[in-house]
Amino acid sequence: MSDQILGVIPARFASTRFPGKPLALIGTKPMIQWTYHHASLSKSFHRLVVATDDKRIHDVVLGFGGESVLTSPDHPTGTDRIIEVAETYPNYGIIVNIQGDEPGMEASLIDGVVGLKTKHRNWEMTTAAVPFTSAEDPKDPNKVKVVFDNKGRANYFSRSPIPASFKGEAKYHRHLGIYAYERDFLMNYNQLPPSDWETVESLEQLRALQNGSTIGVYLSDKANLGVDSPADLEVVITEFKKKGLL
């Protein structure tokens, strides 16, 4: 069981809502460079690579001094892309999936998720969550909710508000899209039986949960700024200016 940790940033050029998103400029740098830079501030990784099926992204990453791997364009999910990269680097015992469209990724969040995974090597994977703010609507299906037990193990992920506010006001936690996998579990992930939870919720992590795997949840106090649309990009640019990054 290797203690080496590999960070992987999947980046696709094709996007229905925002084509070419990884190369969208934030100031003078493309988004993927910001994501790579902030992820590289983490103390957790022994190696950090971008996984992309597009040579334009690949060349940009190499151009700013990052490491990139060209992957098959035919992967049905991001996890499949991560698996291909993990096969290329067989000496890493923990594989971390970092979203390429989160240019403001906090190193402390990465370290929290990875720290939880290294503490519990018997847990198949770990992820993160953050409490909902008063401005957020738990009924928004694009904000995935997670409930977890007193030991920090996920019970369920849903696009619906969970738990229900039947008697009193429930406390909601929003799932954050970062995962740390135990290598052996990741490499056998596609052998897991299909999950009806996964199908109806359209949430890939439910396949692992329904098949009895343990998903640890690191509770963060703040969320990363994600980019799903050009409007989101403008929000990130404004926040980066406030932080003095631009």
From Swiss-Prot:
Source organism of the structure: Leptospira biflexa serovar Patoc (strain Patoc 1 / ATCC 23582 / Paris)
GO terms of molecular function: 3-deoxy-manno-octulosonate cytidylyltransferase activity
Name of this chain's protein: 3-deoxy-manno-octulosonate cytidylyltransferase
The protein's Enzyme Commission number: 2.7.7.38
Family membership: Belongs to the KdsB family.
This protein's record includes keyword Endoplasmic reticulum: no
Protein's pathway: Nucleotide-sugar biosynthesis; CMP-3-deoxy-D-manno-octulosonate biosynthesis; CMP-3-deoxy-D-manno-octulosonate from 3-deoxy-D-manno-octulosonate and CTP: step 1/1; Bacterial outer membrane biogenesis; lipopolysaccharide biosynthesis
Disulfide-linked positions: none
CDD domains recorded: CMP-KDO-Synthetase
Organism lineage string: Bacteria, Pseudomonadati, Spirochaetota, Spirochaetia, Leptospirales
Superkingdom field: Bacteria
Gene Ontology, cellular component aspect: cytosol
